[in-house]
């Protein structure tokens, strides 16, 4: 399953881990995705949404 937000489309980014001696190692920054039950087209569906979208209220949670 792709590490991508179902609402905003945020996905992984690449960058570097930089040590104290400034040695750079490539790494991946992944979005903080959480499974959320929400209603899409009248159906309760479980989607993976980033926490930024959850905090912004872009997703309405449905109780199981």
UniProtKB/Swiss-Prot annotation:
Name the family the entry cites. Belongs to the bacterial ribosomal protein bL28 family.
Gene3D superfamilies recorded for this chain? Ribosomal protein L28/L24
SUPFAM superfamilies given in the database record: L28p-like
One GO cellular component term of this record is: ribonucleoprotein complex
Q: Which InterPro entries does the UniProt record give?
A: Bacterial_rp_bL28 (IPR050096), Ribosomal_bL28 (IPR026569), Ribosomal_bL28/bL31-like_sf (IPR034704), Ribosomal_bL28_bact-type (IPR001383), Ribosomal_bL28_sf (IPR037147)
Q: Which GO terms describe its biological process?
A: translation
* Gene Ontology molecular-function annotations: structural constituent of ribosome
Ribosomal protein as a keyword of this entry, yes or no, is yes
What's the source species for this entry? Bifidobacterium adolescentis (strain ATCC 15703 / DSM 20083 / NCTC 11814 / E194a)
Keyword vocabulary terms for this entry? Ribonucleoprotein, Ribosomal protein
User: Could you tell me which PANTHER family the record lists for this protein?
Assistant: 50S RIBOSOMAL PROTEIN L28 (PTHR39080), LARGE RIBOSOMAL SUBUNIT PROTEIN BL28A (PTHR39080:SF1)
Recorded superkingdom: Bacteria
Q: What is this protein called?
A: Large ribosomal subunit protein bL28
């Amino acid at each position: 399953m792709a590490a991508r937000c179902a609402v905003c489309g945020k996905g992984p980014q690449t960058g570097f881990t930089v040590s104290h001696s400034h040695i750079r190692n490539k790494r991946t920054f992944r979005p903080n995705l959480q499974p959320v039950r929400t209603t899409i087209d009248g159906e309760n569906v479980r989607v993976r949404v980033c926490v930024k979208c959850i905090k912004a209220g872009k997703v309405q949670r449905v109780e199981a």
